[in-house]
């Protein structure tokens, strides 16, 4: 099964309870400050369906020009991320355009212990290695700089007050968010398993269709690796219609 604009619209209209629970879970995390080096914004993080929905809603509420730009950047990210580290599509300058609805991965970055963060990094490297082999089996060798890229551990995040947060608290919050999202039943599983917890994949599939997005990604990535030319992708992105018109 795949998502359609109709299903996303239905979820946006009927998910107020789950989104309130998500807000309450986020509110239990301490407020933080950092030096705004935007290292945590190097990539769009994985997320659950319940985390993706507030951002889709926020996009729909934005002024037309900004909404169009961010959707273009997010869909462009889906096609470009195997060949280039472009930063999160919601980062502009040093500002996050969806900051109030930023994902758990953004909120927890810099709060994990260094040991736990390294464990997450090991898992991420294994996943990237598997992805590299999948592309290689299709005749595409991904750039080493992309495959080897790892968001560095950050020592610059501090809580605003005396509260100390530990891995156990963060894991509890993560589990709670997963449980809230699981309330969407099979749709939660679709997003995790078929869309790989990737908002950029979801928006691309809503725009072009699921199978067409996968085929387009293979063709565009193959061509960009072989030619180092992204003009075909740029043309596609520039001509995108307003996706949110079908979701609101």
Model-derived features: positions:
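Short loop/turn segments that flank or connect secondary-structure elements
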Residues: 1-39, 46-95, 99-248
């Amino acid at each position: 099964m795949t998502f359609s604009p109709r299903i996303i619209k239905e979820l946006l209209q009927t998910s107020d309870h789950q989104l309130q629970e998500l807000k309450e879970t986020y509110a239990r995390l301490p407020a933080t400050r950092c030096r705004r080096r935007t290292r945590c914004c190097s990539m769009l993080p994985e997320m659950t369906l319940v985390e993706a929905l507030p951002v889709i809603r926020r996009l729909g509420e934005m002024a037309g020009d900004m909404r169009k730009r961010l959707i273009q950047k997010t869909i462009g990210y889906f096609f470009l991320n195997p060949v280039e580290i472009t930063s999160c599509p919601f980062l502009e300058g040093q500002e996050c355009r969806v900051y109030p609805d930023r994902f758990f991965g953004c909120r927890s970055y810099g709060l994990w212990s260094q040991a736990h963060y390294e464990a997450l990094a090991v898992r991420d490297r294994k996943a990237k290695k598997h992805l590299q082999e999948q592309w290689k089996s299709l005749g595409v060798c991904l750039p080493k700089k992309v495959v080897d890229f790892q968001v560095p551990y950050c020592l610059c995040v501090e809580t605003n007050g005396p509260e100390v947060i530990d891995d156990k608290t963060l894991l509890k919050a993560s589990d709670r968010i997963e449980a809230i999202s699981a309330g969407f039943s099979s749709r939660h599983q679709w997003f995790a398993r078929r869309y790989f917890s990737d908002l950029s994949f979801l928006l691309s599939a809503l725009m072009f269709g699921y199978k067409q997005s996968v085929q387009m990604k293979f063709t565009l990535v193959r061509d960009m690796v072989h030619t180092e030319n992204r003009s075909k992708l740029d043309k596609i992105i520039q001509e995108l219609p307003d996706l949110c018109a079908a979701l609101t």
